């Protein structure tokens, strides 16, 4: 199996689960956050949906420099949030489909100007900086749902709200 085929399968599975989480977020909870230092529900959900758009910059470029700036999308409602996810997932699949095994072994660097945070093979970046990062923040988002009495979907197993998978 080619590396891209493995990543596509995982991406599709995680995207479907993420979609279930995002679809449950009512716009009236967008400003809510559990602590003053925490991201708002809207900011965290947008970050999760937006990270599915990180495949192309990771696989088609050799670095990301925060010094160049980045403007995250600002979906106005739940439908736009889910549409952002769907758009990014479709683009990620297209990008993965055209990426060969050799490209996954090329190094990629995350930096902020002269400060280098890390350099690692693109396959490792996709796994850790993109996919594991998405899963981490989706987990936080599921706690946000619980704290707002919004039913939490089954993710890797049953939840208290969805005991059947």
What are these regions (language model features)?
Residues 24-25:
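His/Met- and acidic-residue-enriched segments that coordinate or traffic transition-metal cofactors
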Residues 1-9:
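Short, charged, low-complexity loops and linkers
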Residues 98-113:
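Acidic catalytic patch
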Residues 8-19, 29-71, 111-165:
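Short, contiguous alpha-helical
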């Amino acid at each position: 199996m080619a590396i891209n085929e493995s990543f596509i399968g995982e991406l599709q599975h995680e995207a479907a689960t993420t979609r279930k989480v995002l679809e449950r977020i009512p716009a009236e909870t967008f400003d809510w956050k559990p602590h003053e230092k925490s991201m708002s529900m809207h900011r965290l959900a947008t970050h999760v949906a937006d990270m599915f758009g990180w495949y192309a910059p990771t696989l088609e470029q050799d670095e990301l420099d925060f010094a160049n700036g980045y403007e995250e999308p600002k979906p106005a409602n739940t439908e736009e949030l889910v549409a952002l996810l769907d758009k990014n997932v479709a683009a990620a699949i297209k990008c993965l489909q055209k990426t060969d095994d050799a490209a996954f072994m090329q190094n990629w660097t995350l930096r902020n100007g002269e400060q280098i945070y890390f350099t690692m093979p693109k396959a490792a970046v996709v796994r850790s900086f993109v996919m594991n990062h998405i899963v981490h923040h989706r987990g936080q988002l599921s706690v946000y749902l619980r704290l707002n009495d919004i039913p939490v979907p089954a993710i890797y197993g049953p939840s208290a709200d969805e005991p059947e998978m």
